[in-house]
């Protein structure tokens, strides 16, 4: 779990460390998929990463799509947060 993936180097290092520690399955969850520079090429070469979950907080261009990337929508969460802020209600309970 990380806040963002830019070039992917930190993610690849983490995957390699997990593989070295004999992890049976490796998946990653990243909040913001920047995916700049060599990120997709690195992801392509990193066969030990089974799945990369990212949110749609940053739209993925078609050329950044990858078979092991799954994009999760945060639209409902953001909408509910905006509604609660507007109604002066708590947003912290969204994350309990």
Spans of features found by a protein language model:
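PRPP-associated nucleotide enzymes
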Residues: 1-96
